[in-house]
């Protein structure tokens, strides 16, 4: 594949088995392929001040780190607003306040008309993304539901509990599409069943 951009939607490192060197080696190869854009996940929040060492190395490698920021990327014909939300675990807010916090962040960005892509680690806040008229959300966090039951889906996901609503694949509501990657890691539960790791390829067509 020859992608125009590569996006990483958090949990580049595992707070339980952290190896920044491995993550940076991957990044150094990825930036040779295409421009890379990155947002944090909960595991980055959980490693404390070590995160800033990781971020510095990402920036040195040429990665664009989006922490509650919006930028515009363009080609010869079209432009896209690319939005990056920091994982809510970086804040001191209680979990039940995280949804309203993310909603306020998006509102305060004063997003313009036009196609908008949001990078956000957390799929469970899909309703917030829909409310803010995001066209495409790229997310992760759910590990594909860890164990997948045929015709039912994932069994468990962080912050969603058993039989999560947003575990993997595409979700559509109003004018918003969300794609949740199963990712390539395991984290706390070191086993996947019927749940192959994946790297998602998205192709956009202008109208």
Q: Which stretches of residues belong to each language-model region?
A:
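Membrane-embedded segments
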Residues: 1-64
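Active-site neighborhood of phospho(di)ester-bond hydrolases with catalytic His/Asp-centered motifs
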Residues: 5-11, 35-42, 66-69, 117-120, ...
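Acidic/histidine-rich helix-loop elements
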Residues: 12-21, 44-52, 89-98, 151-163, ...
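Solvent-exposed loop/turn segments at secondary-structure junctions
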Residues: 12-15, 42-46, 71-73, 87-90, ...
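Conserved beta-sheet core of the metallophosphoesterase superfamily
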Residues: 28, 122-200
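Binuclear metal-dependent hydrolase catalytic cores centered on His/Asp/Glu-rich metal-binding motifs
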Residues: 56, 60-63, 75-116, 126-127, ...
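Short acidic-hydrophobic surface loop/beta-edge motif
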Residues: 69-76, 169-174
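Short beta-strand-to-coil "C-cap" segments at the C-terminal boundary of structured domains/repeats
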Residues: 202-207
């Amino acid at each position: 594949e020859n992608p125009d951009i590569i996006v990483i939607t958090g949990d580049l490192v595992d707070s339980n088995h952290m190896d920044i060197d491995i993550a940076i080696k991957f990044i150094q190869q990825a930036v040779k392929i295409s421009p890379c854009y990155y947002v944090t996940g909960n595991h980055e929040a959980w490693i404390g001040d070590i995160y800033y060492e990781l971020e510095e190395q990402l920036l040195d490698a040429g990665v664009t780190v989006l922490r509650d920021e919006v930028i515009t990327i363009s080609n010869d014909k079209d432009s896209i607003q690319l939005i990056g939300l920091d994982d809510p675990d970086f804040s001191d807010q209680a979990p039940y306040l995280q949804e309203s916090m993310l909603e306020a962040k998006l509102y305060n960005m004063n997003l313009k008309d036009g196609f908008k892509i949001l990078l956000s680690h957390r799929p469970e806040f899909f309703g917030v993304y829909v409310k803010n008229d995001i066209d495409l959300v790229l997310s992760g966090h759910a590990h594909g539901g860890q164990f997948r039951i045929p015709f039912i889906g994932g069994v468990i996901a962080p912050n969603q509990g058993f039989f999560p609503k947003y575990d993997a694949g595409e979700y559509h509501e109003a004018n918003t599409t969300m794609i949740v990657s199963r990712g390539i890691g395991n984290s706390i539960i070191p086993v996947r069943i019927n749940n192959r790791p994946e790297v998602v390829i998205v192709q956009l067509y202008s109208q």
